[in-house]
Protein backbone atom coordinates (compact mmCIF):
# COMPACT_ATOMS: atom_id res chain seq x y z
CA UNK A 1 0.00 0.00 0.00
CA UNK A 2 1.25 3.47 -0.89
CA UNK A 3 1.34 5.03 2.57
CA UNK A 4 1.24 8.64 1.35
CA UNK A 5 -1.75 7.96 -0.93
CA UNK A 6 -3.50 4.69 -0.07
CA UNK A 7 -6.12 3.20 -2.40
CA UNK A 8 -5.10 5.62 -5.14
CA UNK A 9 -6.53 3.56 -8.01
CA UNK A 10 -9.55 5.03 -9.76
CA UNK A 11 -12.56 3.99 -7.61
CA UNK A 12 -15.08 3.53 -10.46
CA UNK A 13 -13.29 1.92 -13.43
CA UNK A 14 -16.45 1.75 -15.53
CA UNK A 15 -16.76 5.57 -15.37
CA UNK A 16 -13.09 6.53 -15.56
CA UNK A 17 -12.42 10.08 -16.72
CA UNK A 18 -9.16 11.67 -17.81
CA UNK A 19 -9.31 14.34 -15.12
CA UNK A 20 -8.85 12.55 -11.81
CA UNK A 21 -7.07 13.59 -8.62
CA UNK A 22 -7.01 11.18 -5.70
CA UNK A 23 -7.38 12.95 -2.34
CA UNK A 24 -6.61 9.90 -0.22
CA UNK A 25 -3.62 10.47 2.00
CA UNK A 26 -2.77 12.57 5.01
CA UNK A 27 -5.33 15.16 6.09
CA UNK A 28 -5.46 17.17 9.30
CA UNK A 29 -8.04 16.04 11.85
CA UNK A 30 -9.56 17.24 15.12
CA UNK A 31 -12.09 15.77 17.55
CA UNK A 32 -14.08 18.36 19.50
CA UNK A 33 -17.24 18.72 21.58
CA UNK A 34 -18.15 21.99 19.81
CA UNK A 35 -19.44 22.19 16.23
CA UNK A 36 -17.33 25.27 15.41
CA UNK A 37 -14.52 24.51 12.98
CA UNK A 38 -11.37 24.63 15.10
CA UNK A 39 -8.44 26.91 14.33
CA UNK A 40 -5.99 24.28 15.58
CA UNK A 41 -6.19 20.62 14.58
CA UNK A 42 -4.95 17.62 16.58
CA UNK A 43 -2.67 16.03 14.00
CA UNK A 44 -2.82 13.97 10.82
CA UNK A 45 -5.11 11.14 9.80
CA UNK A 46 -4.59 8.80 6.87
CA UNK A 47 -7.72 9.02 4.70
CA UNK A 48 -9.72 6.85 3.89
CA UNK A 49 -9.33 5.04 7.19
CA UNK A 50 -11.61 5.84 10.12
CA UNK A 51 -9.93 7.21 13.27
CA UNK A 52 -10.78 4.06 15.23
CA UNK A 53 -8.53 1.81 13.13
CA UNK A 54 -4.75 1.55 13.29
CA UNK A 55 -4.23 2.31 9.58
CA UNK A 56 -5.57 5.83 10.18
CA UNK A 57 -2.64 6.38 12.57
CA UNK A 58 -5.08 8.00 15.04
CA UNK A 59 -6.60 5.11 17.05
CA UNK A 60 -9.28 7.17 18.81
CA UNK A 61 -12.98 6.47 19.28
CA UNK A 62 -15.36 9.21 18.16
CA UNK A 63 -18.29 9.41 20.61
CA UNK A 64 -21.87 10.30 19.62
CA UNK A 65 -21.51 13.83 21.05
CA UNK A 66 -18.17 14.48 19.30
CA UNK A 67 -17.50 16.41 16.13
CA UNK A 68 -14.81 14.94 13.90
CA UNK A 69 -13.17 17.47 11.58
CA UNK A 70 -11.02 16.85 8.53
CA UNK A 71 -9.06 19.57 6.72
CA UNK A 72 -7.15 19.48 3.44
CA UNK A 73 -5.69 22.36 1.44
CA UNK A 74 -6.39 22.12 -2.28
CA UNK A 75 -4.21 23.68 -4.99
CA UNK A 76 -5.46 22.40 -8.33
CA UNK A 77 -3.48 22.77 -11.56
CA UNK A 78 -5.10 25.29 -13.92
CA UNK A 79 -5.19 22.74 -16.76
CA UNK A 80 -7.24 20.40 -14.53
CA UNK A 81 -10.14 22.82 -14.07
CA UNK A 82 -13.00 22.54 -16.56
CA UNK A 83 -16.66 23.62 -16.24
CA UNK A 84 -17.24 21.67 -13.03
CA UNK A 85 -14.94 20.31 -10.34
CA UNK A 86 -16.72 17.37 -8.75
CA UNK A 87 -15.69 16.30 -5.25
CA UNK A 88 -16.59 12.65 -4.58
CA UNK A 89 -16.82 10.85 -1.24
CA UNK A 90 -17.12 7.04 -1.40
CA UNK A 91 -18.71 7.07 2.06
CA UNK A 92 -18.58 9.04 5.31
CA UNK A 93 -20.07 7.65 8.49
CA UNK A 94 -22.52 9.19 9.37
CA UNK A 95 -23.50 12.85 8.92
CA UNK A 96 -21.07 14.93 6.87
CA UNK A 97 -21.06 18.67 6.26
CA UNK A 98 -18.64 19.96 3.63
CA UNK A 99 -17.09 23.44 3.60
CA UNK A 100 -14.73 25.09 1.12
CA UNK A 101 -12.98 28.31 2.15
CA UNK A 102 -15.31 28.58 5.17
CA UNK A 103 -18.41 28.42 2.95
CA UNK A 104 -20.99 25.68 3.48
CA UNK A 105 -21.25 23.48 0.38
CA UNK A 106 -23.54 20.59 1.35
CA UNK A 107 -24.73 18.18 4.02
CA UNK A 108 -25.01 14.43 3.52
CA UNK A 109 -26.79 12.08 5.93
CA UNK A 110 -26.14 8.36 5.70
CA UNK A 111 -22.97 6.47 6.38
CA UNK A 112 -23.15 3.88 3.62
CA UNK A 113 -23.73 5.80 0.38
CA UNK A 114 -21.43 7.83 -1.88
CA UNK A 115 -22.10 11.51 -2.52
CA UNK A 116 -20.67 14.25 -4.68
CA UNK A 117 -20.84 17.99 -5.28
CA UNK A 118 -19.50 20.66 -7.63
CA UNK A 119 -16.96 22.73 -5.69
CA UNK A 120 -15.73 24.97 -8.52
CA UNK A 121 -17.86 27.97 -7.40
CA UNK A 122 -16.17 27.83 -3.98
CA UNK A 123 -12.55 27.66 -5.19
CA UNK A 124 -10.36 30.73 -5.69
CA UNK A 125 -8.02 30.25 -8.65
CA UNK A 126 -8.11 26.50 -8.05
CA UNK A 127 -7.24 26.90 -4.39
CA UNK A 128 -9.36 26.16 -1.37
CA UNK A 129 -9.41 24.78 2.13
CA UNK A 130 -11.66 21.73 2.30
CA UNK A 131 -13.19 20.98 5.71
CA UNK A 132 -15.49 18.06 6.48
CA UNK A 133 -17.39 18.10 9.78
CA UNK A 134 -18.67 14.67 10.80
CA UNK A 135 -21.07 13.48 13.48
CA UNK A 136 -21.43 9.75 14.06
CA UNK A 137 -24.13 8.83 16.55
CA UNK A 138 -23.29 5.11 16.18
CA UNK A 139 -26.03 3.18 17.99
CA UNK A 140 -27.36 6.24 19.88
CA UNK A 141 -29.89 7.32 17.21
CA UNK A 142 -32.29 6.10 14.56
CA UNK A 143 -29.61 6.28 11.83
CA UNK A 144 -28.39 3.00 10.38
CA UNK A 145 -25.31 1.78 12.20
CA UNK A 146 -24.95 -1.82 11.06
CA UNK A 147 -23.31 -3.91 13.77
CA UNK A 148 -21.37 -1.01 15.27
CA UNK A 149 -21.76 -0.53 18.98
CA UNK A 150 -20.10 1.68 21.58
CA UNK A 151 -19.72 -1.38 23.83
CA UNK A 152 -18.71 -4.09 21.35
CA UNK A 153 -19.22 -7.70 22.38
CA UNK A 154 -20.66 -10.82 20.82
CA UNK A 155 -21.71 -9.96 17.26
CA UNK A 156 -21.12 -6.22 17.74
CA UNK A 157 -17.90 -4.51 16.71
CA UNK A 158 -16.34 -1.16 17.59
CA UNK A 159 -17.63 1.95 15.82
CA UNK A 160 -16.11 3.25 12.60
CA UNK A 161 -16.53 6.99 12.08
CA UNK A 162 -15.79 9.54 9.43
CA UNK A 163 -14.28 9.07 5.98
CA UNK A 164 -13.77 5.38 5.29
CA UNK A 165 -13.98 5.16 1.49
CA UNK A 166 -11.94 6.94 -1.21
CA UNK A 167 -12.16 10.69 -1.80
CA UNK A 168 -11.36 12.14 -5.22
CA UNK A 169 -11.85 15.02 -7.62
CA UNK A 170 -12.89 14.98 -11.25
CA UNK A 171 -13.14 17.93 -13.57
CA UNK A 172 -15.79 17.70 -16.27
CA UNK A 173 -17.40 19.76 -19.00
CA UNK A 174 -21.03 20.87 -18.78
CA UNK A 175 -22.16 18.17 -21.21
CA UNK A 176 -21.11 15.30 -18.91
CA UNK A 177 -23.62 12.47 -18.48
CA UNK A 178 -24.55 11.23 -14.99
CA UNK A 179 -25.27 7.69 -16.21
Please give the residue ranges for each predicted region.
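N-terminal pre-domain segments of enzymes
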Residues: 1-20
